[in-house]
Design a protein with these regions (language model features):
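The feature captures the conserved acid-bearing segment of alpha/beta-hydrolase catalytic domains
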Residues: 6-95, 110-112
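Hydrophobic core segments within long, regular secondary-structure runs in both alpha-
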Residues: 4-5, 138
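C-terminal catalytic histidine-bearing segment of alpha/beta-hydrolase fold enzymes
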Residues: 45-48, 75-76, 82-143
Length: 143
């Protein structure tokens, strides 16, 4: 979608098939992720994840409920996931070890001057977006 610059993903860090630890992968036939992908560049990304999500574990690892080939769907740690996206979009520094700012229960990890942002929503699960204040979301969209 060439006309879309801002992307928002809610409770959806990379899964273990989309990134193998080295490369992004394209979904193929029968959900096989074998072809190396080059994700979009020149875009802005906001990811929102809850620390208490039983379906998509914040710290990575297999979902307790989402099936996948060979068992349960594995996920990449949410903070690692946004770091991988930031590197793909042009970030050359180290992974952030702490939040860039804190807004209540939300820790904000910001890369590339706010073009790649992760909201770590503490004490929330798969409903993490419900904890967002409209102003915090608009702040990302306005930049």
């Amino acid at each position: 979608l060439p006309n879309i610059k801002n992307y928002i993903s809610a409770v959806s860090p990379l899964n273990g098939f989309q990134h193998d630890g080295k490369n992004f992968k394209l979904r193929g036939k029968e959900n096989n992720y074998e072809v190396i992908a080059k994700p979009l560049s020149g875009v802005r990304l906001l990811n929102i994840s809850g620390t208490e999500d039983p379906l998509v574990p914040y710290g990575g690892g297999p979902s307790k409920a989402i099936p996948a080939k060979g068992g349960k769907l594995p996920f990449v740690d949410a903070e690692e996931s946004i770091f991988l996206w930031a590197k793909n979009i042009g970030y050359e520094g180290k992974k952030l070890g702490k939040a860039s700012k804190v807004d209540g229960k939300i820790e904000v990890f910001s890369y590339l001057d706010g073009d790649v942002v992760h909201f770590k929503v503490n004490e929330h699960g798969h409903n993490a977006t419900q904890a967002l204040r409209e102003e915090l979301l608009l702040e990302f969209l306005r930049d």
